[in-house]
Regions:
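N-terminal intrinsically disordered/low-complexity leader segments
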Residues: 1-18, 203-205
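Amphipathic alpha-helical linker/stalk segments
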Residues: 11, 69-97, 140-146
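Hydrophobic/aromatic residues within well-ordered alpha-helical segments
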Residues: 19, 62, 69, 73, ...
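Helix-turn-helix
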Residues: 22, 26, 30-64, 68
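Hydrophobic alpha-helical connector segments
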Residues: 68, 83-108, 160-164, 188
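Amphipathic alpha-helical packing segments from all-alpha helical-bundle domains
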Residues: 75-78, 125-149, 158-162, 170, ...
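Short secondary-structure transition hinges
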Residues: 97, 104-140, 151-152, 159, ...
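Amphipathic C-terminal alpha-helical segment
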Residues: 104-108, 112, 144, 161-182, ...
Length: 205
């Protein structure tokens, strides 16, 4: 048995939840750098400081592990968007808070953002279903406010919600990829002004 394997085996056992979190963190790093298809379970286990059998005790396959990482960060982003919308009763401030939530997510967790929006697995049905659900859940939170405030039909409000969410996501992604000289605050203000000028054109009830 190798020295590294002996070291891993002699390490104190972490509680199951802590070990799972450690594995998910290591997997995110490897999947982001290598992509799903080139990522190796050996590398993920080594980065997490566990043996490969331990990794497989938690996640029976590489796809199971990938989906668990995806679910964790989808839930995190959806929560941040919902929290932003609920943070103020003022609609202009809601738009700003929602845009800022995307930029905040990408600034604090660029690896997770790349996993969600630049995945080489987006055509995999189980991945596509989760990404669609993420978009729907974020857009639904926005559209509920639009429908309530304007009286627009739910289908119309949902389309507008998808448009707002999509714009925030794409501009935040561009800001990250281009290493923009604009500060986060400047970028958020620009995108918020664009969105608010559009959505405020719909009269309130």
């Amino acid at each position: 048995m190798s020295t590294s394997a002996n070291f891993r085996d002699n390490k104190p056992r972490l509680p199951r939840d802590e070990r799972r979190a450690l594995l998910l963190s290591a997997a995110l790093e490897v999947f982001t750098v290598a992509g799903y298809h080139s990522a190796a379970m050996d590398e993920i286990a080594d980065r997490a400081g566990v043996s490969k059998p331990v990794l497989y005790q938690h996640f029976p396959s590489k796809l199971d592990l990938y989906l668990a990482v995806l679910d964790l960060h989808i839930d995190s982003l959806v929560f941040e968007i919902q929290k932003a919308i609920a943070s103020t009763p003022d609609n202009a401030n809601r738009v700003r808070a929602t845009v800022d939530a995307y930029f905040g997510f990408i600034e604090s967790d660029g690896e997770a953002f790349r996993l969600l929006f630049e995945s080489d697995m987006s055509v995999e049905p189980s991945v596509a279903e989760r990404l669609d659900r993420m978009t729907y859940d974020c857009a639904a939170a926005v559209s509920a406010i639009i429908s309530l405030d304007t009286g627009l039909p739910k289908e119309v409000a949902m389309l507008l919600g998808v448009g707002l969410i999509g714009s925030a996501q794409v501009t935040a992604r561009h800001w990250l990829q281009r290493d923009s000289k604009l500060s986060r605050q400047q970028a958020v203000e620009l995108v918020e002004n664009l969105m608010w000028r559009g959505i405020s054109g719909f009269p309130s009830k």
